[in-house]
């Protein structure tokens, strides 16, 4: 064998090895949590969603950059091996702690990994473009031990079918009850061997939104209020990449941005996504017992097939071993797997005073079908909905007014208040006019625009 042939085979073998090591990432995001009230020490968690292959097994660590001018810090994959979460997807978690030297308006923590999947249609030569995610967050004394939003719905239901709307929702929750908003972003890249700001956070080469690739028009949007990412509807088979941002707001000030970068695979198979129905958004007084039924049904495929379906639910109203969970009592959701249509799930929650807050609880429900493997490789499709639930303080009970003519005054008395929480206030309004009862709307607190002061 000639030296030229040996060199050729070696080159092919080398490139093949590189490709096997460089193609496995589907999506991911970085979560930040302050873990000390005395120092600026934070815990950083990178969650990635990957193919179930050797490249994923070999990704035992990643490089973090913390945005303060320091060098790379290496974080090990925690909790042992990757976790199989279905649909050919593995979940990987990398954790590291870091202490910042001083407060700042914003720090940008980022991770770049040289393993983006090959053949992504809206990124040129995607296999050569590092996977990249970042989270920016503010450090100041007024924020306390703040955490950035946690994304409960994994990037696993990422298969779309030509001609059908695709939906994904991250089911983001916030530990402190801050307001969340959503917007589209662009997929980015970065040098995984340096923390230089000049070489990180760059727009991926020739990136276009997924709906801008095919000649047939379609829309690709995200609902700024509930996080529904909808592609209506994919037109061409292939891999596509996208990214969106979850903004965290407190008292009208933005305090963090979390990026989820993820892949959508469009296929042409004989399957129709199921449909899910949730109750109307609701507002209740603390102490109300909630019991609601969630319904879902599969949709006939082209060949007239109905598949078994499973309903899932995520939210911080359920028991979780993290700071993101609400205080007890927790909500419960029960639903049998792989039901025939219509499928049923039951949500129950005994609300209490400690659940009162300004922002809604966004409870995520998802239905997934389970087609046979011999139909398009068993491609599972989903539908999802967000149910918004707000809990307000209960009304005062037993209110009585005793008129004192001698002093032209009234003595107000009421029963012991049910939700006498720390820093809670009962505000008394008065009005010098004829007495006409005012009936507040179900979720209105106070006496807005009624003439009372």
Predicted regions and their residues:
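Structural beta-strand segments of beta-rich domains
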Residues: 40-44, 166-168, 288-292, 408-412
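Strand-loop-strand motifs at the edges of beta-sheets in extracellular beta-sandwich domains
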Residues: 209-234, 325-352
């Amino acid at each position: 064998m000639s030296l030229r042939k040996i060199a050729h085979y070696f080159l092919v073998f080398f490139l093949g090895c590189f490709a096997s090591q460089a193609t496995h990432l589907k999506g991911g995001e970085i979560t930040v949590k302050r873990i000390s009230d005395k120092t600026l020490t934070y815990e950083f968690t990178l969650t990635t969603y990957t193919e179930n292959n050797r490249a994923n097994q070999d990704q035992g660590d990643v490089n973090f950059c913390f945005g303060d001018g320091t060098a790379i810090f290496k974080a090990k994959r925690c909790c042992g091996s990757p976790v199989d979460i279905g649909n050919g997807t593995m979940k990987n978690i990398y954790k590291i702690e870091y202490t910042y030297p001083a407060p700042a308006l914003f720090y940008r923590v980022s991770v770049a990994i040289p393993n983006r999947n090959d053949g992504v249609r809206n990124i040129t030569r995607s296999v050569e473009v590092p996977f990249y995610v970042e989270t920016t967050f503010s450090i100041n004394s007024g924020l306390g031990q703040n955490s950035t939003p946690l994304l409960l719905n994994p990037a696993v239901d990422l298969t779309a079918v030509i001609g059908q709307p695709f939906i994904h929702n991250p089911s983001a929750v916030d530990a402190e009850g801050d307001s969340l908003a959503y917007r589209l972003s662009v997929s980015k890249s970065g040098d995984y061997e340096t923390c230089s700001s000049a070489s990180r956070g760059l727009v991926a080469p020739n990136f276009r939104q997924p709906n801008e690739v095919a000649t047939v028009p379609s829309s690709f949007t995200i609902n700024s209020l509930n996080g529904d990412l909808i592609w209506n509807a994919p037109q061409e088979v292939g891999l596509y990449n996208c990214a969106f941002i979850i903004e965290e707001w407190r008292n009208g000030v933005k305090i963090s941005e979390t990026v989820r970068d993820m892949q959508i695979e469009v296929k042409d198979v004989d399957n129709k996504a199921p449909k899910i129905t949730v109750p109307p958004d609701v507002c209740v007084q603390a102490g109300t017992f909630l019991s609601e039924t969630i319904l879902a049904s599969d949709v006939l495929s082209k060949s007239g097939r109905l598949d078994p379906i499973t309903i899932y639910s995520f939210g911080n109203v359920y028991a979780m071993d993290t700071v993101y969970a609400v205080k007890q009592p927790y909500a419960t959701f029960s639903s049998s797997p792989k039901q025939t249509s219509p499928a049923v799930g039951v949500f129950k929650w005994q609300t209490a005073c400690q659940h009162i807050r300004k922002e809604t609880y966004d409870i995520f429900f998802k239905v997934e079908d389970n087609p046979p493997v011999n139909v398009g490789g068993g491609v599972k499709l989903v539908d999802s909905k967000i149910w918004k639930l707000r809990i307000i303080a209960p009304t005062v009970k037993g209110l009585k007014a005793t008129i004192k003519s001698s002093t032209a005054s009234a003595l107000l008395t009421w029963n012991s208040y049910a939700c006498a929480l720390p820093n809670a206030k009962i505000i008394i309004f008065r009005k010098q006019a004829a007495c006409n009862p005012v009936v507040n709307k179900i979720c209105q607190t106070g006496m807005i625009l009624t003439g009372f002061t």
